[in-house]
C-alpha cells in the first residue's frame, strides 16, 4: 500500500513542473485562455483553437512530467485497489483511475500539434474517466463510513469538474475561457489522488480509532 500511496502523492510534481514550464514561455501564457496541452506542444504556431500563439520551449519537460503522472496514477491505483472499501463501487472507481492514467500516457505520445485526434481522445479519457473515478470512489467511501472527508471531496469535486468539462466542450465564453474551464475540469482529478495518497500514508501511522 505504501508504494501505491507514494505514487499518488508523487502526482504533485505535475503542478510544480507545470509552473516551471510555463515560466519558460516568451509569448504570453494565460491560464484562462491557453489549453494545458499547449505546454507540451512540440512546435511554435498560432493556435486557432485558443486564438493565440503557442510556443513552449520546455515542452519535453512537460511531456515527461505528464508521462510520470499517468504512470503514477495508473500503477498507484492498481497497487491501492485493496486499500479502498471492498465493494464493487470502489473497484469501479479504482479501475477508472487506471484508465485515466493510461489516457494521460496517450496524451503524451500524441502531442496536440502532431496527432490531434489521438491527443483529444486521450485527454477525454483522462479527464472524464478521472472525474467519474472521483465521484464513484467518493460514493464508495461514504457508503463504507471511511474517510468521510475524502468521500465528500470526491463527490463534490468530481461534480464541479464534470460541470466544468461540459462548459469546456460547449466552449462557453469562447477561446477566452477555454483554459479556465479545462483546468477546473482536470485539476481536481489530480488533486484527489494526491489527497487520497496522503490520507493512506497518514493512516499507516495513526491509531485506527482516529481514522474516521
Give a label for each model feature.
Residues 27-58:
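Extracytosolic (periplasmic/ER-lumenal) interhelical loops and adjacent juxtamembrane/interface segments
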Residues 47-82:
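Individual transmembrane alpha-helix segments
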Residues 58-68, 117-135, 181-187:
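Membrane-interface loop-to-helix entry segments
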Residues 97-139:
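Membrane-proximal helix-loop-helix units in multi-pass membrane proteins
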Residues 137-212:
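Terminal transmembrane helical module of multi-pass membrane proteins
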Amino acid at each position: 500500500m505504501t508504494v501505491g500511496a507514494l505514487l499518488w502523492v508523487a502526482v504533485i510534481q505535475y503542478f510544480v513542473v507545470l509552473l516551471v514550464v510555463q515560466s519558460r514561455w516568451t509569448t504570453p501564457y494565460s491560464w484562462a485562455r491557453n489549453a494545458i496541452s499547449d505546454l507540451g506542444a512540440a512546435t511554435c504556431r498560432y493556435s486557432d483553437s485558443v486564438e493565440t500563439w503557442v510556443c513552449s520551449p520546455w515542452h519535453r519537460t512537460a511531456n515527461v512530467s505528464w508521462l510520470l503522472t499517468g504512470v503514477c496514477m495508473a500503477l498507484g491505483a492498481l497497487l491501492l485497489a485493496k486499500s479502498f472499501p471492498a465493494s464493487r463501487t470502489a473497484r469501479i472507481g479504482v479501475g477508472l483511475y487506471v484508465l485515466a492514467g493510461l489516457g494521460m500516457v496517450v496524451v503524451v505520445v500524441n502531442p496536440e500539434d502532431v496527432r490531434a485526434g489521438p491527443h483529444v481522445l486521450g485527454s477525454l479519457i483522462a479527464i472524464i474517466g478521472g472525474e467519474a473515478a472521483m465521484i464513484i470512489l467518493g460514493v464508495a467511501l461514504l457508503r463504507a463510513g471511511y474517510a468521510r472527508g475524502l468521500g465528500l471531496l470526491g463527490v463534490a469535486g468530481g461534480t464541479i469538474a464534470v460541470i466544468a468539462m461540459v462548459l469546456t466542450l460547449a466552449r462557453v465564453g469562447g477561446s477566452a475561457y477555454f483554459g479556465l474551464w479545462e483546468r477546473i475540469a482536470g485539476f481536481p482529478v489530480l488533486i484527489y489522488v494526491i489527497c487520497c495518497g496522503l490520507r493512506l500514508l497518514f493512516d499507516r501511522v495513526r491509531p485506527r480509532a482516529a481514522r474516521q
